[in-house]
Amino acid sequence: MRGYFIAGNWKMHKTCAEAVALAQELVRELRGGPHTYMIAPSFTALDAVGKVLRGSNVLLGAQDVSSEEWGAHTGEVSVLQLEDLGVQVVIVGHSERRHGRGENDKLINQKVRRVLESGLRVILCVGERLQEYEAGCTNEVVGTQVRAGMADVCGSLMHNVTVAYEPVWAIGTGKTATPAQANAVHAHIRSVVREMYGAAIAEALCIQYGGSMKAENARALLAEEHIDGGLIGGASLEAASFVPIARSV
């Protein structure tokens, strides 16, 4: 049976001191919780936050990684460096990287494989933009991103893969995906993975929802059959908004 995976992506928020304080509060609040939890602070706070999380049930995540292994790549951070800081999970292909920084499926796949080959876990983000949603292309776009993101990934590594569905059109636009709409896309993602890897791997795959999950809608979303957790942005920046989501299931 799939467990729930509740993850917070802090994006470019929090000073190091603020990140440490929030991490300490979350460790206290989530201690003994029945699910998998993760927080992904900025690179600058990874070391300090990692020390807070050590020995807790909250995993340390990174928001991105270089596709390169090592060497002369100014401004890049390698998976080896992340692993050295105690990072356990890496977010790859977030919509803000795809559409804000021009990352394409080929680069995202390189990052996915780099993370998995290192033995770390990866969260592969997929999702359609507003114009793609309005054109009825959701399944086509998301399916293409899943297939491309997992290209050449061995089935034996799939236990370290989580997929996060981000309907970009539902983030900061005033539009929302209903639980049923989100679940239908999650079911499609699972069917694509079933075609690629077979039923056992597809049924075991954790698929998070990343479309503005909040305490107010978390319970309804997480009650859906194919929604196995959340990749949470704004609501993860305060314990008062993140903990209720984590406790909603």
Swiss-Prot record:
Subunit record text: Homodimer.
Entry annotation: catalytic residues: H94, E166
Location of this chain's protein in the cell: Cytoplasm
UniProt-listed CDD domains: TIM
Molecular function in Gene Ontology: triose-phosphate isomerase activity
Reaction(s) the record says it catalyses: D-glyceraldehyde 3-phosphate = dihydroxyacetone phosphate
Pathway(s): Carbohydrate biosynthesis; gluconeogenesis; Carbohydrate degradation; glycolysis; D-glyceraldehyde 3-phosphate from glycerone phosphate: step 1/1
UniProt entry keywords in alphabetical sequence: Cytoplasm, Gluconeogenesis, Glycolysis, Isomerase
Superkingdom: Bacteria
Biological process annotations from GO: gluconeogenesis; glyceraldehyde-3-phosphate biosynthetic process; glycerol catabolic process; glycolytic process
Similarity-based family: Belongs to the triosephosphate isomerase family.
Enzyme class: isomerase
Protein name as annotated: Triosephosphate isomerase
